[in-house]
């Protein structure tokens, strides 16, 4: 029987060529990219090439691209890092009520374990955040806003550029993070055009890439 796979938003099949390249790297170019020997130099080339590719796709600088183990770690690092680094400026964080657990659980951790105050924005009947609620939630203690690009359950697309514009108009120093895990590969995402400071993606869900588990 021919298989019909309808769960690509959860995990995609890797292209055979991608699998072959991964096998080559693991079996031949397996050096530590931080090492100075030949194997290390060859391994470092892959990382540099990947950074160049993402920087070109996103229209950002290579130094602004960071690799993590996946979407959850990227979200965790962005939220916890930004919150802790800016705690002297304020302790108020904003997110939506329908974020992925990688965001919700991290916000709860910051709220319950580290004393931050979190506002969870409501959404309308289409699963989109209410921009008026975002305006009302902003205050002098707000240091970070995190809104997902595309919802992983119902597929609603958030008005990221409009939301970021509202935040930056209120206070340009408030950091804006977007979880674009479900949006990357489906939409053209340019962080600077969107006016966001941090953007998390994961190739697992939207492209024929190797698995991260």
Model features per residue range: what roles?
Residues 34-73, 77:
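Conserved N-terminal alpha-helix of the aminotransferase class I/II PLP-enzyme fold
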Residues 82-104, 117-122:
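Conserved PLP-anchoring active-site segment centered on the Schiff-base-forming lysine
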Residues 119, 123-183:
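Active-site phosphate-binding strand-loop segment of PLP-dependent enzymes
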Residues 5, 175-178, 184, 190-204:
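Conserved active-site segment immediately N-terminal to the catalytic lysine
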Residues 1-35:
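N-terminal "arm"/small-domain region of PLP-dependent enzymes with the aminotransferase-like
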Residues 205-213:
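Single conserved hydrophobic/aromatic residue that forms the stacking wall/gate
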Residues 61-65, 89-91, 140-141, 173:
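Short acidic capping loops at alpha-helix termini that bridge into adjacent secondary structure
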């Amino acid at each position: 029987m021919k298989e019909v796979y309808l769960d690509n938003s959860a995990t995609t099949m890797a292209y055979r060529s991608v699998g072959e390249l991964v096998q080559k790297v693991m079996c031949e170019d397996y050096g530590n990219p931080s090492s100075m020997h030949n194997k290390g130099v060859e391994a470092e080339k892959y990382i540099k090439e990947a950074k160049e590719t993402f920087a070109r796709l996103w229209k950002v600088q290579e130094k602004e691209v960071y690799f993590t183990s996946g979407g959850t770690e990227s979200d965790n690092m962005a939220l916890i890092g930004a919150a802790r680094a800016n705690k002297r400026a304020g302790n108020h964080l904003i997110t939506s009520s329908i974020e992925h657990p990688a965001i919700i659980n991290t916000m709860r951790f910051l709220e319950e374990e580290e004393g931050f105050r979190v506002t969870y924005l409501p959404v309308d009947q289409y699963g989109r955040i209410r921009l008026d609620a975002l305006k009302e939630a902003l205050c002098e203690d707000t240091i970070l806003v995190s809104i997902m690009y595309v919802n992983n359950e119902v597929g609603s697309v958030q008005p990221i550029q409009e939301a970021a514009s509202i935040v930056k108009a209120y206070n340009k120093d408030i950091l804006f993070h977007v979880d674009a895990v479900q949006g990357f590969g489906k939409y053209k995402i340019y962080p600077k055009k969107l006016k966001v400071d941090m953007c998390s993606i994961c190739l697992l869900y939207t492209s024929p890439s190797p698995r991260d588990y």
